[in-house]
Amino acid sequence: MQQRTIQKAVEVVGIGLHKGEPIRLRLEPLSANAGIVFYREDLALNIPLSPDSVIDTRMATVIGSEKGFISTIEHFLSAVYAYGIDNMRVIVDGNEMPIMDGSSISFCLLLDEAGIKELDVPKKVICVKKAVEIKEGDKFVRLLPSDKATFDFRIKFDHPVIGVQSESFEFGTHNFIEEIARARTFGFAKDIQYLQSQNLALGATLQNAIGLDDHKVLNPEGLRFENEFARHKILDAMGDMMVSGHNILAKYESFAGSHNLNYRLTSKLLADSRNYEFVTVKELQSRAFAKSFA
């Protein structure tokens, strides 16, 4: 299996979650070994994708520097992970990605429109060799050696609609589109009101998130999956793992994980070369991982 980029440039316009203003997103092909490079068109600022570029993880994953930043990249990056894209230029004209419908499906459709192009250089993945874990109270995220890429996520909320939920997912592009990509982000009405008083979440609506009051889901159409909340957490985790710039071959496990825990996990993984190795897909003993991108 070779490195991938997209066949042609594509673009879409959507609303930014926090400012509530239109954001133009344009994707362009890049050559082998270029990586995923974000670009703030309004600032003429390149931001290469890597854990070193992460500057905030409180409400979303944010990359940048003192010169400028791009927020809420994780939903987009989960689609990039799912399609096995290694090299691409990601251009936005503001400080956040468009939220679209709060899931990844719009980005999947955009990548379908762009098409996938295989390059002349073998694709490398991060193969986890040793268990790596981050714990915070009873919360944890961990990566374990595995010959498959799997995600197991459990959440617990003191809310009658959510309660305790879990989802186990074996990665594959088709599986992602069917089981994970449409799972939306969610928020509580009382929190949204406070955030908007702070000039945040100004673009949040029931068209781009699951809204909940103290008792029920506010969206007239209801949920897309019974455990949509847990599925969205897997979507987030995939996007946060993609901040490494590569697909990761491992078993991911979490209870009540967050963007911050995911960021600390990838940073800890990559901080010690004994934890992992870069392996071409061709070198992997298991061919199942290569078939995941079919």
From Swiss-Prot:
A GO CC term attached to the entry: membrane
Superkingdom, natural source: Bacteria
Enzymatic reactions: a UDP-3-O-[(3R)-3-hydroxyacyl]-N-acetyl-alpha-D-glucosamine + H2O = a UDP-3-O-[(3R)-3-hydroxyacyl]-alpha-D-glucosamine + acetate
GO molecular function: metal ion binding; UDP-3-O-acyl-N-acetylglucosamine deacetylase activity
InterPro entries assigned to the protein according to its UniProt record, in alphabetical order: Ribosomal_Su5_D2-typ_SF, UDP-acyl_GlcNac_deAcase, UDP-acyl_GlcNac_deAcase_C, UDP-acyl_N-AcGlcN_deAcase_N
Record key words, sorted: Hydrolase, Lipid A biosynthesis, Lipid biosynthesis, Lipid metabolism, Metal-binding, Zinc
GO BP term, pick one: lipid A biosynthetic process
Residue positions of the active site: 259
Coiled coil segments of this chain: none
Annotated residues for binding of Zn(2+): 75, 232, 236
Keyword Metal-binding: yes
E.C. number: 3.5.1.108
Listed pathway(s): Glycolipid biosynthesis; lipid IV(A) biosynthesis; lipid IV(A) from (3R)-3-hydroxytetradecanoyl-[acyl-carrier-protein] and UDP-N-acetyl-alpha-D-glucosamine: step 2/6
Cofactor(s) essential for the protein: Zn(2+)
Top-level EC class: hydrolase
Family listed: Belongs to the LpxC family.
Protein name (database record): UDP-3-O-acyl-N-acetylglucosamine deacetylase
Naturally occurring in which organism (per UniProt): Sulfurovum sp. (strain NBC37-1)
